[in-house]
Amino acid sequence: MKKILVASTNNEILDIVKSVCQKYSTYFDPIFCPDTDEALSFIDYELPELKLIDFTSDDIDSSRILSAIHADPWLHNGGIIAVVPNPSLVQQIEDMKDPNILIVQTLYTFKQNFERLIRILWGNQKFLFNRGLQDRVGGQENGTFVCGNDPMDIRLYTSFLVNYLFCSNRISDDGRYALQTTLMELLTNALEHGNCGISYAEKTQWL
């Protein structure tokens, strides 16, 4: 069972996490920390696989938690889901290029996507919890995703992958958006062809 630290006092976030984790109670155990020091202590001693850091909660010093994790290599297991109040802060946090951050969501998109995020993360644990290890020991990273038929899943899969490549300095900021757009287009086309039974030759002929 994977532990999820939830550093938040926002009832909207707490309710969503409780509801989703009830459905996945066999796999995820949420630990709620409404205090910054409590959250840091839990991270230090329990090393939770997932950390949900809520930048919408005024009572939580989210930047301090993020900095503490970034500064200590022992805490670089698993990953961070950051929830922020607006899109401009999404960009600001992504530009920090912290490889511990899996994804940054506004409160609105988090409420829409958290259950989907949990399902995807559970189904792709190898990529989630081992990412970066091969690079640190001088090896080469590789992995696979198993993606279903939901177009929204494609958006999240590409976000995970492209964000990791960007944060680990494998692609530039311009390259990040170009790669995300390309992957979205390729995977969406593949999904459409698979669902409709349309071959590449047939589509080319009609176009």
Predicted feature locations:
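Output/docking surface of receiver
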Residues: 34, 83-127
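Two-component/phosphorelay signaling modules centered on CheY-like receiver
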Residues: 11-33
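Bergerat-fold GHKL ATPase/HATPase_c domain
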Residues: 116-181, 192, 196-206
